[in-house]
């Protein structure tokens, strides 16, 4: 029974000495600081500066100690890695969009090329090596002079020119 009494009194003394700060003592602690400081009996400025030194807006540099792990530091590292990964994915997505736009712009608007420039476009496309060969082949095939549609339009022009010359004579 005596042992139980000693244990109970020790527990009560321990609980009262480790009680959180009273409202009077809390007035010195600002609201933007972590609430963990309210659990301590005494203020330890070195500990507060070390813990608060890792916040995003602070310019305080913290020296690394071997063998110590910090939850805040690990979260900063993970946050930086996630941000770098998101930036990398966005860059890849933007690069793919740029490539798709480039391919689209190479194919669009090439069908309305004047007849006099058709040979130049065919030669410049054939001399260029691009990894998008099927797209170039379709464009070249449409513009080439051996194309029956292209040859037919030339024949129509020649017929009209000859008819105009005959009228003038």
Curated annotation (Swiss-Prot):
Expressed in brain, ventral ganglia and the retrocerebral complex (at protein level). GO terms for molecular function: hormone activity. Residues 83-108 form a coiled coil. Residues Ile-66 to Gly-109 may constitute another form of the DH44 peptide, which has not been detected yet. Keywords: Amidation, Coiled coil, Hormone, Pyrrolidone carboxylic acid, Secreted, Signal. It comes from the Eukaryota. The modification Isoleucine amide is found at residue 108. One of its GO terms (cellular component) is extracellular region. It is found in: Secreted. The modification Pyrrolidone carboxylic acid is found at residue 97. Its main location: secreted. Residues 19-96, 109-169 form a propeptide. InterPro entries: CRF. It holds the Pfam family CRF. Residues 1-18 form the signal peptide. Regulation of fluid secretion. Belongs to the sauvagine/corticotropin-releasing factor/urotensin I family. This is Diuretic hormone 44. It comes from Camponotus floridanus.
